[in-house]
Amino acid sequence: MSTPSAAPACVIGHIAVRDQAKWVEYRDQVAATLAPFGGEVLFRGRKARVLGGAHDAELTVVIRFPSLDAAHGWFDSPAYQRLIPLRMAAADVDLVSFSG
């Protein structure tokens, strides 16, 4: 049986953009930070309809990594950490990692 860190993992982001220009600047720089950790954007889209509960974010992104360790390595990397102030100025973002 695989250990949790060996299972594929995803980072899911729920995003409410406050400054479109800063958001585009941030978004355009993220891809380069994903590659060293095997990350790839699986889905990026706008909210179509809430089917149950509440969901205020307008955008959702799903990023796949080969493992939870890789996902956390990406988030903790100096390259991504440098982008966080720009992300915080651009949008309200909830990021959650999942393994499985």
Regions found by a protein language model. Name each.
Residues 1-59, 66-76, 99-100:
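Short S/T/G/P-rich N-terminal loop/turn motif that feeds into the first structured element of a domain
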